[in-house]
Amino acid sequence: MSLRRLAQVSLGLGGLILMGMGAYFVFLRPPLLPEDARYVGASLAQIQSAIPLFLPWVSRVFGVLGGYMFATGLLTAYLAATSFREAKPLPSAVVVVSGLVSIGWMAVTNFLIDSDFKWLLLAFVLPWLVAVLSSLIADMRASKARG
């Protein structure tokens, strides 16, 4: 498999992962995880008692966040299947920036809050990282071959 193809497939996988995360946030994620209550230093019952409408509200917030994750993943997968196939600078720059501010920042934040899911999220960064590095190496080799 060529480096360009590896970059394309890895980016597509990263897009599918984001779509899966988005679906989880929309359909399966509870309003608060045990780690959320632990982080704020209160039990779920205390939070519910102190702010009765918080759980329904945050459930909607996570639903919206999940929709954005799914859309980001869909666009990432589309980019992998179309313009990322060619060694053009703009799609590569979009992939770098969008990966940094989406799954990259999510992984960093989960390490900052010592999330139970920090290692899983770091693993979800790997396809994006493979895509970026493979693309960069392929571009450098192509540039060197052209002289």
Regions found by a protein language model. Name each.
Residues 16-62:
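Hydrophobic transmembrane helix segments
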Residues 73-91:
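Juxtamembrane helix-break-helix junctions at the cytosolic face
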Residues 128-146:
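Membrane-water interface at the C-terminal end of transmembrane alpha helices
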Residues 75-79, 100-109:
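Hydrophobic, membrane-inserted alpha-helices
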Residues 33-37, 142-147:
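Short, Lys/Arg-enriched, Gly/Pro-containing loop segments at transmembrane-helix junctions
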Residues 104-123:
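Membrane-helix boundary connector in multi-pass membrane proteins
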Residues 4-19:
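Alpha-helical transmembrane segments and their helix-start/interface "positive-inside/aromatic belt" motifs
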